[in-house]
Amino acid sequence: SSAASDVYKRQVHNEDYFVKLAMQLEKMGADTICIKDMANLLLPYDAYSLVKKLKANVGVPIHLHTHNTTGTGDMTNLMAAQAGVDIVDCALSPLANGTSQPATESLVATLKGTSRDTGMDLEKLSEIAAHFRKVADKLDINPKVLKVDTNTLLYQVPGGMLSNLISQLKQANAEDKYYDVLAEVPRVREDFGYPPLVTPTSQI
């Protein structure tokens, strides 16, 4: 079983909180601890520090799940790797970045020849990516969800919620209200006591 903890509002949930929670989850029988960075808010040096502390305090594998919404996902994964993270989530390049995960090929190339070499073959990954490039073209993905939006560092909206928001605004012919809606999110979250914006909260 994997226990996941969402990273969000630093003023409410700090590093010590997450380390203590991970230790409790391990005692309860978790086989892995997953840091779920639902909106790419975990910055690279914070990831390094958190993973280092988790590795020093729990014995089960540490798994990092982040996105590339704010454009720091690749750096966050790299710093987590330097700190000893056991697992990171990536996506093949045709389906990567923005509200998705950082690109697999980029991380594989970056770590090649280091102590964290993944052992993956870039040429084979390129062949697989070529297939999924055709799949991505058929999916007609809104290009906005694959772009970096550094405003996410302020609004803290997770990738899945962001892509759904864009779709709903498009259906309502209100795409021009996108940034107005995002600006309202932090105020509403504060009123509700800073809940994490993951299911079920993200569906409200």
Language model features: what each stretch is:
Residues 146-151, 156-204:
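Terminal or standalone catalytic/regulatory effector modules within metabolic enzymes
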Residues 100-104, 111-114:
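Mobile "lid/hinge" segments at catalytic clefts and subdomain interfaces of large enzymes
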Residues 83-100:
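Glycine-rich phosphate-binding active-site loops on the catalytic face of alpha/beta enzymes
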Residues 9-14, 37-45, 68-73, 94-99, ...:
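Short, small-residue-enriched loops and turns at beta-alpha junctions
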Residues 5, 47-64, 109-120:
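Alpha-helix-loop-beta-strand connector modules within alpha/beta enzyme cores
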